[in-house]
Regions:
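Structured C-terminal subdomain patch of bacterial secreted/periplasmic proteins
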Residues: 195, 288-363
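Bacterial N-terminal signal peptides
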Residues: 13-22
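Bacterial N-terminal signal peptides that target proteins for export
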Residues: 2-13
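Proline-aspartate-enriched helix->loop->beta-strand connector
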Residues: 142-145, 149-155, 173, 285, ...
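Extracytoplasmic substrate-binding proteins
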Residues: 71, 163-239, 336-363
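Alpha-helical, coiled-coil/dimerization segments enriched in small aliphatic residues
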Residues: 241-276
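A short, structured surface patch at a secondary-structure boundary
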Residues: 89-144
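Bacterial lipoprotein signal-peptidase II cleavage site
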Residues: 23-59
Length: 363
């Protein structure tokens, strides 16, 4: 709105009053369009999508984001951000934005809050004591998402289908994954979600800060650099096969970021360069022979079962115990798919476990 200055003091006063009334009306209309949003998130501050520093990128609108389902046009700066499925809310929170609604964590949570510890800590830091959490374990709760009245829906790291995307797009513009479900790295999560919020500059800074944290922490473990590593999952109920997360998967790519490498014997099995996993028979256990370290989900009882298996037990890393089995359903297991908040929260514990496994290579 352009208001020309007048010399008359009375005119200035009148115009000021008009402007105040107009702004109040806009605010009222926005509130009316989303009933109960303040109650769901605890207080008015919790519904604001502003950075903690109160700054935002000088983004030019409209912006277009290309993704696996086509492209999304965001016409103006989103004021109400909703995130769905895994980790996208953590990216928003790391950027100082409290979503007006987000999906409950369905793995690694130790109570009934639906929040992983790093999420809970950040919400507390931002003063959001009653977040609006979607319970969508059995599928997206489209009604709850719509009721949150979002201006944008962040799903850069997700497994949404074309049908999901079409339904969500009727509610608000959707930032979807770029190519395949569940393979978005933590950097890409930040990059695309930040762009969807009109916060590219802040997102780039968050990436730099997180990269520095990782580099600083990894530098304390120089013996980790160059070690051959594989993320492999076994099941005590069926040891006739095993499952590998490749470097395409965020779990695998993060291990490489820490300075380790996947052995060529494994990467050669990736006939599809975009495949994030391999399902192999126990007869192929020798593919893991070059691994200095094996990381996976499980506990000591699973390790003992694998060690006793006539095929899997021949893997050198299994024989010597240079393995990291991360307890199922724990926060550390949930952080295997990393994001800036989970990295900062768990990296010391994770590196300590890896260092312990490395100590057994020549032991």
């Amino acid at each position: 709105m352009n208001i020309k200055r007048k010399n008359s003091l009375s005119t200035l006063i009148i115009l000021s009053l008009v402007l105040i009334i107009a702004l109040a009306g806009c605010s009222s209309n926005k509130s009316d369009s989303s009933t109960d949003s303040t109650a769901k998130t605890g207080d008015t501050a919790n519904t604001d999508t502003t950075t903690t520093e109160g700054t935002a990128s000088d983004t030019q609108y409209p912006i277009t984001i290309k993704h696996a389902f086509g492209e999304t046009v965001i016409p103006s700066k989103p004021e109400r951000v909703v995130t769905i499925q895994w980790a996208n809310h953590d990216v928003a929170l790391a950027l100082g934005v409290v979503p007006v609604g987000f999906s409950a964590a369905n793995y690694g949570v130790q109570d009934d809050s639906g929040l992983l510890p790093w999420t809970a800590d950040k919400l507390k830091e931002l003063g959001a004591d009653k977040p609006n959490i979607f319970q969508d374990t059995d599928g997206l709760d489209f009604e709850a998402i719509s009721d949150a009245n979002p201006d944008v829906i962040l799903a850069a790291y997700s497994g949404i289908t074309q049908e999901d995307y079409d339904t969500l797009s009727k509610i608000a513009p959707v930032v979807a994954y770029q190519s395949q479900p569940w393979v978005t790295t933590w950097r890409e999560q930040v990059l695309y979600n930040a762009k969807g919020m009109g916060m590219e500059r802040e997102g780039e800074q968050l990436i730099k800060d997180t990269e520095k944290l990782i580099a600083d922490k990894a530098s304390k473990y120089p013996n980790m650099k160059g070690k051959k590593v594989v993320w492999a999952n076994f099941s005590a109920t069926d040891l006739s096969k095993f499952h590998i997360y490749t470097p395409v998967d965020p779990r695998g790519s993060f291990l490489e970021e820490l300075g380790m490498e996947y052995p060529e014997s494994v990467t050669k099995q990736m006939t599809d360069a975009t495949s994030y996993s391999l399902n192999l028979s126990a007869e192929n256990a020798d593919l893991l022979n070059d691994a200095d370290i094996i990381i996976g989900y499980g506990d000591d009882s699973l390790y003992q079962a694998v060690k006793a298996d006539p095929l899997l037990g021949k893997i050198p890393a299994i024989q010597r115990g240079s393995v990291v089995f991360i307890g199922n359903g724990t926060p550390l297991a949930a952080s295997g798919n990393p994001n800036p908040l989970s990295i900062a929260y768990t990296i010391d514990e994770y590196l300590g476990l890896i260092d312990g496994a490395i100590s057994k290579i020549n032991g």
